[in-house]
UniProtKB/Swiss-Prot annotation:
GO cellular component: membrane
Annotated protein name in UniProt: Taste receptor type 2 member 125
UniProt similarity note: Belongs to the G-protein coupled receptor T2R family.
Localization per record: Membrane
Amino acid sequence: MGIVIGIICAFIIIVQFIIGNVANGFIALVNIIDWVKRRKISLVDQIITALAISRIDMLCSTFLIVLITSLYPDLNTAVNMVKISNNIWIVANHFSIWLATSLSIFYFLKIANFSNYVFLCLRWRLSKVVSVTLLLSLVLLLMNILIMNMHIDTWSDGFKRNVSFGFRSKNCTRFFKLALLINTTFTCVPFTVSMVAFLLLIFSLWRHLKNMQYHAKGSRDPSTAVHIKALQMVVVFVLFYTFFFLSLAIQLWTSESLEKNNLFYVTLIITFPSVHSCMLILRNSKLRQASLLVLWWLLCRSKDIQTLVP
């Protein structure tokens, strides 16, 4: 990677890090304040708040790992450092991904309209479905950490036996590609769940519109509007999720060293938790209204400061 591209990627990472933390911090703060005032919080606000906190954790852990490995590249070959950094990122990424997936499940079960008995049972127990989904995902998290640590130990043993297993060697590139393959494989599960929920929601909207046409009713009834609004939320999520998933998959097929393109791939990966959170604010009426109030307050403050300056 050229110096200019590296500087641009580093600048984008810093900007996304700031925007992502501000957006996610704003989401968490607004929902927590509303929770304290009302002394209750809805399921969707619980998911969004937990998602915002997990994304702050992911952004901070990713930024710190990149910063430490850039300033101290020799630590990349230290087994304990590799394990710690991998485990931290795996945990942060896991909760960020699975909470986002739980949000898509929520919209599907809450908005979609099917007469299937299983679907109705899941809708009636929506809170339990989300809780069980997150609990079952912990099994995948444990498996991901165990397999990754076994892979690191295998690489470490080979590194100790043979000096050619240096960090800049082809063997080390294979190590990172295999590690990436492991993480991408575990990311396939929530990605598939989200895609299924997305497709079923589209099918539900299509059936609903077909029924409206059959009964000679307009397509702008309340149920259709709710369907479309939920579908817009899920479409934005799926688009960014697909972008995130492809950014992981592309790294497996690149022929260049992962080290050379490290900043570029980090830029792609942190786009999802940063930009999608901004879209959540714009699409959520409560968060959008709170953000407009904050912007109005900042605008008034800036005008007051300008009038005080001679």
